[in-house]
């Protein structure tokens, strides 16, 4: 056989009559199977009936305890030779001092800016050389150091990970560089209405005395106060093995993971770690509209909500179904109303951000400026309707199918599975939690949805935050008479 470049493939030298005969043979074979019989059996007026999906089978979560009290969880997934490691620490922004918001996220950032004998460029270069992805971050509830690496590069990548977690240098020059970079990023937020709403809304809902009310990355003033000694102090107080858990997902066994991690983290020194701070949710106030003026804004950004629920709530599964119906999917009520029916927005959504403490419930959209008041009317209509009217059975079934049929995708890759299993470590959930997830979603009834809607969505106590051009939207909002209007700035502070 010789390559035929004109055909882009291989031929056997067939030409002329031989090629024609071959074609006739193909036609003859095809004609043996008439299609009319199959067509007669199909009723194309009805959609095909799908069989029930197979039960979701998840690998077991195996556990062990390393020297120093470090807890290890391993999820074996051997189809692809990659490994994901997540070190989860009780070092989130809930630990930020009241006078220094942003310290936890800044400390997490600094872990990659020099560790052991490596500077920031050497850390980045070595991760790239190993084909690894190394990330450090902090949320309100936890700090996470994560590593994704091919199995054959696991051991040298673990050496790099150990340096980053155990031996950060916090060089003054790098603290200064990262501090100035963050200050510039914060200044830029003032030009982004969506970012403004993301900062102002939790500050208004919770107030600055609650951990969830403080900006995750701090303010311009608090960032200017960041110094090496404060970063090192925070690290020393929170980055301890007795306040950490390691999750390993991928092509590795429990015995192998325990051996490799003990060799690198077995000497991690325990230390006294203060309990995670508790904070009561603020008392609800009567429905109020908070207007953040952004002159010349192309759209108005709307956030409507109040304090919601903690991750440990027994209503979690009913709330997942409720939110899918209300605003958790493209076909949900809010998006169908504000986008598809009225054309006020490209997308309207809702979410219960359940955390270690009671996180916020929020419904949100960026809307046409001239339709700000009309959008608020439709938002409030849908938020009241989900409480007042029972959910029809077809809508309930569709929401439950949306959740359960999408669940397998959360465990298809080691990275996706690691992200879901990480929830178990952050929130102290049972290790078999996801094995029963679909079952508990399917057990939710229409009565459950209405019950949790009435309990956890309270229109009389909504904080309605609107970021937009005051000169264009104020009159329309006032005419709605949905509550007093209070003027706030980027940080949620009152403007006199």
Regions found by a protein language model. Name each.
Residues 42-49, 116, 122-234, 397-419:
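Acidic/histidine-enriched segments that form metal/cofactor-coordinating
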Residues 42-49, 208, 212, 216, ...:
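An aromatic/glycine/proline-enriched structural segment found at the starts
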Residues 181-200, 280-299, 336-345, 355-356, ...:
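Short acidic/His-enriched helical or mixed secondary-structure segments at domain edges of catalytic enzymes
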Residues 84-148, 213-215, 329-344, 355-357:
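M16/MPP (pitrilysin/insulinase) zinc-metallopeptidase core fold and M16-derived inactive scaffolds
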Residues 44-64, 185, 203-244, 276-281, ...:
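Histidine-acidic residue clusters that define the catalytic metal-binding segment
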Residues 93, 303-307, 326-367, 488:
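A structural supersecondary motif
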Residues 113-117, 148-179, 329, 349, ...:
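M16/insulysin-pitrilysin zinc metalloprotease superfamily fold
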Residues 40-54, 245-247, 365, 397-496:
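C-terminal regions of mature proteins
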């Amino acid at each position: 056989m010789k390559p035929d470049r004109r055909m882009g493939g291989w031929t056997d030298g067939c030409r002329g009559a031989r090629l024609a005969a071959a074609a006739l043979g193909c036609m003859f074979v095809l004609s043996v199977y008439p299609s009319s019989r199959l067509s007669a059996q199909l009723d194309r007026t009805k959609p095909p009936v799908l069989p029930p999906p197979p039960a979701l089978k998840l690998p077991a979560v195996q556990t062990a305890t390393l020297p120093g009290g470090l807890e290890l969880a391993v999820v074996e997934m051997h189809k692809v030779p990659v490994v994901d490691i997540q070190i989860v620490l009780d070092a989130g922004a809930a630990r930020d001092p009241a006078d220094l918001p942003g310290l936890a996220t800044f400390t997490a950032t600094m872990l990659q800016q020099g560790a052991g004998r490596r500077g920031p460029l050497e850390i980045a270069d070595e991760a790239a050389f190993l084909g690894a992805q190394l990330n450090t971050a902090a949320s309100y509830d936890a700090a996470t150091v994560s590593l994704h690496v091919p199995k054959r590069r696991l051991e040298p990548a673990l050496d790099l990970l150990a340096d980053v977690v155990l031996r950060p240098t916090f060089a003054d020059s790098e603290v200064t560089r990262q501090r100035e970079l963050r200050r510039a990023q914060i200044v830029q937020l003032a030009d982004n209405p969506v970012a403004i709403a993301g900062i102002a809304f939790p500050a208004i809902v919770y107030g600055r005395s609650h951990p969830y009310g403080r900006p995750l990355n701090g303010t311009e003033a608090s960032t200017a106060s960041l110094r090496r000694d404060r970063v090192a102090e925070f690290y020393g107080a929170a980055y301890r093995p007795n306040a950490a858990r390691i999750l390993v997902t991928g092509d590795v066994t429990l015995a192998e993971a325990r051996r490799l991690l003990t060799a690198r983290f077995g000497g991690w020194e325990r230390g006294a770690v203060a309990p995670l701070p508790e904070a009561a949710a603020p008392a609800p106030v009567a429905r109020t509209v908070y207007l953040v003026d952004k002159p010349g804004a192309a759209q108005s950004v709307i956030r409507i909500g109040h304090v919601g629920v903690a991750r440990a709530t027994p209503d979690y599964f009913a709330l997942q179904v409720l939110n899918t119906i209300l605003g958790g999917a493209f076909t949900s009520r809010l998006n169908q109303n504000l986008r598809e029916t009225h054309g006020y927005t490209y997308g309207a959504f809702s979410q219960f951000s359940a955390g270690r403490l009671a996180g916020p419930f929020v419904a949100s959209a960026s809307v046409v400026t001239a339709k700000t008041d009309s959008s608020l009317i439709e938002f409030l209509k849908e938020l009241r309707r989900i409480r007042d009217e029972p959910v029809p059975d077809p809508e309930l079934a569709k929401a439950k199918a949306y959740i359960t049929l999408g669940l397998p995708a959360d465990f298809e890759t080691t990275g996706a599975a690691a992200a879901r299993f990480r929830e178990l470590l952050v929130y102290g959930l049972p290790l078999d939690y996801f094995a029963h997830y679909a079952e508990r979603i399917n057990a939710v009834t229409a009565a459950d949805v209405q019950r949790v809607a009435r309990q956890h969505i309270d229109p009389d106590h909504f904080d309605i935050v609107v970021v937009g051009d005051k000169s264009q939207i104020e009159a329309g909002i006032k005419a709605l008479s949905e509550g007093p209007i209070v003027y706030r700035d980027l940080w949620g502070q009152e403007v006199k």
